[in-house]
Amino acid sequence: GYSERYEQLRDARVDTEGLSFSFIPDTNSMEAFQSFFPACTGAPGFAASLEEETGIFTLRLYNTRLKSGEYTREMAQWASSWDYDGLYPRTIPEGPLGEDNLFLSQVEICQDGDDAVITARLTDRAGWFTVDSGNLGYDNIPYLRLRFRERDSMEVECGI
């Protein structure tokens, strides 16, 4: 694995521009649960790769589970000031992740050992992508977004 931190996917989806994920503590063991510290824990480590001959894009989210264990009373007491009630049990089913978009088709997700793996076929429009991450809610739910852009597009930052 990439790190000693363990996470559980809360949400995984194909959106208009790419892929979006949010994460909660892994409840498969107390040790895994305690490795996730709200406000200090970001999105999991990941690796992205492209098989140029086939156009298959692969995203590996290290130490990330698709299916939660039981959210125990001990976990609830340990996480007392962070409200995870109602978030478990949670399962992201293996298989197709959602509808195609302008940049991705045939998007699928699976569990590979300790890692969640997402594969997609890039369309001819996909040129490059950016990564955005942060925390949602009360800084207790990290997120990760991959936004794809067309080959000849430019990002322009406008500020006041």
Model-derived features: positions:
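Short linear recognition/processing motifs and adjacent strand/loop elements at protein termini
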Residues: 1-160
